[in-house]
From Swiss-Prot:
SUPFAM superfamilies according to UniProt: S15/NS1 RNA-binding domain
Protein name as annotated: Small ribosomal subunit protein uS15m
InterPro entries named in the record: Ribosomal_uS15, Ribosomal_uS15_bac-type, uS15_NS1_RNA-bd_sf, uS15_ribosomal
GO cellular component, one term: nucleolus
Family stated for the protein in its record: Belongs to the universal ribosomal protein uS15 family.
Alphabetized UniProt keyword annotations: Mitochondrion, Ribonucleoprotein, Ribosomal protein, Transit peptide
Transit peptide: 1-57
Higher taxonomy: Eukaryota, Metazoa, Chordata, Craniata, Vertebrata
Organism (species): Mus musculus (Mouse)
GO biological process: mitochondrial translation
Disulfide bonds: none
Length: 258
């Protein structure tokens, strides 16, 4: 976006340079642009600036659980005695202001663990894993606000969100009270997944219609086959009824008549 705005500005400057001078006004003095005389910007420049401001999204605000920058790192706090009495320059070096992003995320995770989990040292519980994923997701979101085309971080962000959804579902089924507390402290809203979701494609619809048509044709053929069998059985039964049951009894009668 910055590159596009810069190109628009450069094109406007090139047009202003190549534009022919305005003929002299009354009084013999050469006239400059009306916008330059009035102290206004050219309309194309204003349009480019407004378009850039409309496209640019606001930066995500900081979270409420953000640790203060003047706080000291825990490792240094335990090692150095009387850390409050050291020089201001040393305090700034040992504070979170000069700490790395990894240390800040670690401190943020520890704060949330102390607030939610009963045993902060146990990182294998479901709520502890959800806290770690939430801190990671917020870090990815802040990164994506600055670098929107970073596909690797976007993939990790979506994978972390799916993993957190799965853990929240399991925690909701096992311990609902802890689930409510975790969602409230983290500011996470859990939505129930639909019972059945399948994205409909044209290929799927065509295949389903073909399967239904084949099933109907098979049922029709089976019905015809059953009808033919019934007709053959009926014809056979009628034929058997027309023939005498004991033909050996009928032969002596004919001989006696002769």
């Amino acid at each position: 976006m910055l590159r596009a705005a810069w190109r628009a500005l450069s094109s406007v400057r090139a047009q202003a340079v190549t534009r022919a001078p305005v003929p002299a006004l009354r009084g013999g003095s050469s006239a400059s642009l009306l916008s330059a005389r009035c102290g206004l910007q050219p309309p194309s420049l204003l349009r480019a600036a407004r378009a850039y401001a409309a496209v640019q999204k606001p930066v995500q605000p900081k979270q409420d659980d953000e640790p203060p920058s003047s706080a000291f790192i825990k490792e240094y706090k335990d090692i150095i005695p009387n850390i409050e009495k050291v020089d201001d320059v040393v305090k700034r070096i040992l504070s979170l202001e000069m700490a790395s992003r990894k240390e800040k995320l670690k401190i943020k995770q520890e704060q949330l663990m102390n607030k939610i989990v009963e045993n902060p040292e146990d990182s294998r519980t479901l709520e502890a894993q959800i806290i770690a994923l939430t801190v990671r997701i917020r870090n990815y979101e802040e990164h994506m606000q600055k670098h929107r085309k970073d596909k690797a971080h976007k993939r990790h962000l979506l994978m972390s969100i799916d993993r957190r959804k799965k853990l929240l579902k399991i925690l909701r089924q096992t311990n609902y009270d802890v689930f409510e507390k975790t969602c409230k402290e983290l500011g996470v809203e859990y939505t129930l997944p639909p019972l059945h979701f399948q994205k409909v494609h044209r290929r799927f619809l065509a295949k389903k219609a073909l399967c239904i048509r084949v099933y109907q044709e098979v049922q029709k053929l089976k019905k015809q086959k059953r009808a033919l069998k019934a007709a053959a059985a009926a014809a056979k039964k009628e034929k058997n009824e027309g023939v005498p049951e004991n033909p050996s009894n009928a032969v002596p009668e004919k001989t006696q008549v002769n």
